[in-house]
């Protein structure tokens, strides 16, 4: 056998489970051949429509390519983990006032709007079901010391203050806790921003 280390490339055949050393050339999946023919027959008689889970314009375009007839669930929280967005959502979470939260959300709104526009374009008029921010806020706050220090510095707070905020977000059962519509009740400015981004 061989020992792999962090940063080493390996490839896995999803059908057989076989592992290959290094990055091997791949081809994009397609619906063709005998499978495509059988699916075409099924399309002639089916009444059920197939929708996809897609959270980005790229995922939506891929889903349409494979025949999805809409998006059954677009999870907006996945949009917040990319690039500069996570910094803005963390600032929003650690803000002391509605005005500070709205300032952070103003950074996120055009990004969300752009994502929704891309998704709508990719879906070519097919229905899209969008779920507003759902997970508990503790999922967005930093856990690494360096990230906590950076957030404290960016917000003009002490590390202790940020750690207190993070500790305050901990829940015994986050699956049943402060999330989803409960978040919208506590922080209506989040739902307002997302509503504007969806509609614009």
Predicted regions and their residues:
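Conserved alpha/beta-domain cores
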Residues: 31-34, 41-200
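Short, compositionally biased
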Residues: 20-37
């Amino acid at each position: 056998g061989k020992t792999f280390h962090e940063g080493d490339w390996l490839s896995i055949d999803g059908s057989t489970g076989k592992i290959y050393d290094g990055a091997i050339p791949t081809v994009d999946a397609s619906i063709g051949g005998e499978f495509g023919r059988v699916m075409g027959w099924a399309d002639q008689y089916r009444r059920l429509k197939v929708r996809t889970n897609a959270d980005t314009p790229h995922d939506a375009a891929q889903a349409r390519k494979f025949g999805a007839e809409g998006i059954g669930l677009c999870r907006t929280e996945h949009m917040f983990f990319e690039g500069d967005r996570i910094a803005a959502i963390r600032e929003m979470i650690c803000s002391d006032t509605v005005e500070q939260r709205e300032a952070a959300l103003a950074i996120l709104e055009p990004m969300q709007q752009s994502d929704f526009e891309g998704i709508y374009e990719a879906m070519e008029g097919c229905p899209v079901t969008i779920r507003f921010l759902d997970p508990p806020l503790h999922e967005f706050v930093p856990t690494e010391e360096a990230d906590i220090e950076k957030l404290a510095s960016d917000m003009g707070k002490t590390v202790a203050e940020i750690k207190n905020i993070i500790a305050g977000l901990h829940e015994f059962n986050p699956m049943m806790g402060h999330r989803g519509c409960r978040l919208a009740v506590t922080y209506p400015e989040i739902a307002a921003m997302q509503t504007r981004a969806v509609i614009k």
